[in-house]
Curated annotation (Swiss-Prot):
Subcellular location field: Nucleus
A GO term, aspect molecular function: ATPase activator activity
Organism: Eremothecium gossypii (strain ATCC 10895 / CBS 109.51 / FGSC 9923 / NRRL Y-1056) (Yeast)
Protein name (Swiss-Prot/TrEMBL): General transcription and DNA repair factor IIH subunit TFB2
UniProt cross-references to Gene3D superfamilies, sorted A to Z: 3.30.70.2610
This protein's record includes keyword DNA repair: yes
InterPro entries, alphabetized: Tfb2_C, TFIIH_p52/Tfb2
Subunit and interaction comment: Component of the 7-subunit TFIIH core complex composed of XPB/SSL2, XPD/RAD3, SSL1, TFB1, TFB2, TFB4 and TFB5, which is active in NER. The core complex associates with the 3-subunit CTD-kinase module TFIIK composed of CCL1, KIN28 and TFB3 to form the 10-subunit holoenzyme (holo-TFIIH) active in transcription.
Family: Belongs to the TFB2 family.
PANTHER family attached to this UniProt entry: GENERAL TRANSCRIPTION FACTOR IIH SUBUNIT 4 (PTHR13152:SF0), TFIIH, POLYPEPTIDE 4 (PTHR13152)
Length: 514
């Protein structure tokens, strides 16, 4: 199994697991308050595994208790692991509780969740859970305008992370969030924010996972500001269930949620007119928060689609009901050539992209040479890789990025080569090698060069009166485990910072002049 391509393709499942883990760790009283919102119940249901969804739909409209043995009978023998995982997840979320009879192995749906989720499915008493739609005014906001706004906000964040020179930077709250989430850190020399290892991993995820990464960090920060986590989560789940292109009133929102709208504007999740803050519009980034259908390959996919429309002169009109191109839908589609990479055995790289964001990401580990209208060329060099490594990006991440964005022809060629090997030797255990092995191995070797150099804080001992004094002190440092390096010929040794005082005290006792 090749782990590297899975970094992106499994991003949708990755963010689901992370959100579920956050929800599972909430105290039960907080979970119960969350389940009072039908929109939140619907969103949580969407985040569950398929088997957990099946169990909930089987129990939602029946009042009798259910035996765990019955659930076990519904599952095939080879799916027992998924069964236990689904039961465990529902128990941690307190979606299922002990039955009223108190008999062992008898369970029932959480009564609060059951009532709210039933209302969400049947259109019952949902109150303000799914927002209050308000009438449009004379100057309506189109979906193309919302896509352009969301792309501009999200593009600003991603460009800032990769260090592209910009005329504008994200707001203070966004910068604080990037630091708090450890996606960026302050460079000791320049005193400016730079991308971290986690930040580059963030760029490898799909848009859903990226947004949830920031929102989960926002939740942890909100707790430090004494913001009610139930209000925060309810608003996040609510905007994920709203209809794109509709205007919604802020009436009915708590003060915490109204404050949140200001922050969500900076992330491109909602749009508000400065002249009328009494209503807001969810953007496409918001409506795909809990979506299982649409998965944009990367945030730059949404950005690039808007850039292409601008270049083609598309104004406020909607293209086939969406402002996102078909090549931006479905993770990893081979039809999406924008940003596709070709890597040669001579370390030359070609990227079919004119996206400033894509080019900026490449510049983190590639020495760019030439830029054409729809393509850039560059060279993978020792210096460019070492620069990336010094910035916290690992060799595996660089390889993963290039494999994930490899041109479909490279994938087909790798597949053909693997088939030929299997024809000659059916027992061959080689895996699909999309990138040239020489390039992959060399990038890993360049990382090993840096890994060989390890720095320690400590003290150097030298200029001894005689060989015996050197040998006794060096042996003592070795015996107590503080000796880091020694050179018998030069009569020098190096001890750790913590062991320096012990060595000095021993020298005073052993060699003090009488």
């Amino acid at each position: 199994m090749e782990p590297t391509p899975g970094i992106i393709h499994d991003g949708h499942n990755l963010f689901k697991n992370t959100v579920n883990e956050y929800l599972q760790e909430l105290p039960q009283p907080v979970q119960s308050r969350l389940y009072q919102s039908p929109a939140t119940c619907l969103a949580i249901y969407r985040l569950l595994s398929p088997m957990a969804k099946f169990f909930i739909m089987s129990m939602i409209f029946q009042d009798e208790e259910v035996s765990l043995r019955d659930l076990d009978r519904w599952v095939k023998p080879d799916a027992k692991f998924q069964l236990h995982d689904a039961i465990k997840s529902m128990k941690l979320l307190h979606l299922i509780t002990e039955g009223r009879s108190g008999q062992p192995l008898m369970v029932q749906l959480n009564s609060i969740f059951k009532e709210s989720f039933k209302n969400a499915l049947t259109g019952g008493e949902v109150k303000n859970s799914f927002g209050n739609v308000v009438e449009e005014e004379n100057d309506p906001v189109t979906m193309a305008m919302l896509d352009s706004y969301a792309a501009d906000k999200w593009e600003t964040i991603l460009h800032f992370m990769v260090g592209t020179p910009l005329t504008k930077s994200p707001g203070k709250n966004v910068l604080s969030l990037l630091r708090h989430s450890k996606l960026m850190e302050v460079d000791e020399s320049s005193k400016e924010l730079k991308i971290t290892n986690e930040g580059f991993q963030f760029l490898l995820q799909d848009a859903n996972a990226q947004i949830w990464t920031l929102l989960l960090q926002y939740l942890t920060m909100a707790e430090t500001f004494q913001m009610d986590p139930v209000d925060v989560l309810n608003l996040i789940f609510m905007i994920g269930a709203l209809e794109l292109g509709k205007a919604y009133s802020v009436v009915g929102l708590s003060e915490t949620q109204k404050t949140m709208l200001q922050d969500l504007r900076d992330y491109g999740l909602v749009f508000q007119k400065q002249s009328n803050l009494s209503k807001f519009y969810p953007t496409r980034l918001a409506t795909m928060l809990t979506s299982d259908v649409v998965s944009i390959r990367s945030a730059s996919g949404a950005v690039n689609s808007v850039l292409r429309q601008r270049a083609e002169g598309v104004d406020g009109k909607v293209l086939n009901g969406t402002a996102l191109g078909d090549d931006d839908l479905q993770a990893g589609g081979e039809g999406a050539l924008d940003g596709a990479l070709i890597v040669e055995t001579n370390f030359k790289l070609y990227s079919y992209s004119n996206s400033p964001l894509q080019i900026a990401i490449l510049s983190l580990f590639i020495h760019l040479k030439t830029r054409f209208q729809n393509m850039v060329t560059g060279q993978i060099t020792r210096e460019s890789i070492r620069r990336a490594l010094h910035n916290g990006i690992t060799a595996d991440q660089i390889i993963a990025y290039m494999e994930t964005h490899a041109h479909p022809q490279m994938r087909r060629l790798a597949g053909d080569n693997l088939e030929k090997k299997l024809e000659l030797d059916p027992n061959c255990r080689d895996t699909l090698q999309v990138l040239p092995p020489t390039v992959v191995d060399q990038i890993k070797l360049w990382q090993l060069e840096l890994d060989r150099i390890i720095s320690y804080d400590g003290y150097l001992f030298r200029d001894f009166d005689n060989l015996q004094e050197y040998q006794v002190l060096a042996q003592y440092a070795r015996d107590i485990g503080v000796l880091l390096w020694s050179d018998d010929k030069k009569k020098m040794f190096f001890v750790s910072k913590e062991g320096n005082a012990q060595v000095i005290d021993f020298h005073k006792r052993k060699f003090r002049k009488k």
